[in-house]
Amino acid sequence: MATRNSPMPLGTAQGDPGEAGTRPGPDASLRDTGAATQLKMKPRKVHKIKAVIIDLGSQYCKCGYAGEPRPTYFISSTVGKRCPEAADAGDTRKWTLVGHELLNTEAPLKLVNPLKHGIVVDWDCVQDIWEYIFRTAMKILPEEHAVLVSDPPLSPSSNREKYAELMFETFGIPAMHVTSQSLLSIYSYGKTSGLVVESGHGVSHVVPISEGDVLPGLTSRADYAGGDLTNYLMQLLNEAGHAFTDDHLHIIEHIKKKCCYAAFLPEEELGLVPEELRVDYELPDGKLITIGQERFRCSEMLFQPSLAGSTQPGLPELTAACLGRCQDTGFKEEMAANVLLCGGCTMLDGFPERFQRELSLLCPGDSPAVAAAPERKTSVWTGGSILASLQAFQQLWVSKEEFEERGSVAIYSKC
């Protein structure tokens, strides 16, 4: 738990390969003896130049090269579309702005997020983001790099076909692979089996994985996550007398990261004298505001979503229900012993300890063990970086030639 009166920084922030049993796990690099080189494959430039890993999230698109420990680029998933009615005749400025381009314009913009609760709803914006990643951020020629793209749990199967069409037809990449975000997350832990509990900005999932196989029939989803926590914090602050609006969400996001925490025993926190909870926060205009119980009350919505108007169960209940659906005793024990937290929303101070307590109360006979890796905010990307670096994985790239021969369904042959 965060120290209640510790000084806080002031200001605002800137902003399934192969068949079952054949998937190369994260420890394959320790076992790999070069057997994959005996495969009859045409040599491609893709093996000589590092692959690109792209994890498109609701808040940021994380990207970088395979083999790196963490993503190099964090690109906002918000795209700015210029308003046609505001443009003068002969205006040659860009109509779509991404990343740092959004900071350097005075033109009226319509802000669009291409994802809703983790699912792509605007493919044009996805194309705009990827174009920015290749040409502006990474400054690379996409036709020279294989690309691994993450796909959220329970997403429409057509998503993978659309990813393939965009990458091969629009960007001309030589090879690609699409795989489950949850599978990549578990690889970041160095495991191939476990219960992945991931909560990012727009959606949360509880996903059982057995020896590299994602089990969608046992997977649970909740349409709340870090973005909803931010909105709830703004509601609490306004109830305390402030006047924040959606235009201030970046400030609220920073307050959440720097001042808020999950209380291990919220009843005890409520009994503290105000002075033990209060911290001052300096707004960009220099004004100081005091934040009290809102610091821990906001995180309660992850355990009681009804506080923020949701009818879905809290994350511990969602996880306990998933364990309850595991009928095989040995499998259930394995899942309970490997509950893995992933995603930025789980980075809140005190959350792992509180989650462990709540889950243990709900599943006393299962002895659940919760793990929280320090870099779990980027667990999906890191898992992709590990996977794409393995020699045993190289046979699982879908080539441009395969796409041209079979169309977008070629993606299902290896993904």
UniProtKB/Swiss-Prot annotation:
Compartments where found: Cytoplasm, Cytoskeleton
Tissue specificity note: Detected only in the testis and, to a lesser extent, in the prostate.
Family annotation (SUPFAM superfamilies): Actin-like ATPase domain
GO molecular-function terms, A-Z: structural constituent of cytoskeleton
CDD domains xrefs: ASKHA_NBD_ACTL7
Residues recorded as bearing Phosphoserine in the entry: S6
PANTHER family in UniProt: ACTIN
Family: Belongs to the actin family.
The protein's name: Actin-like protein 7B
Gene name in the database record: ACTL7B
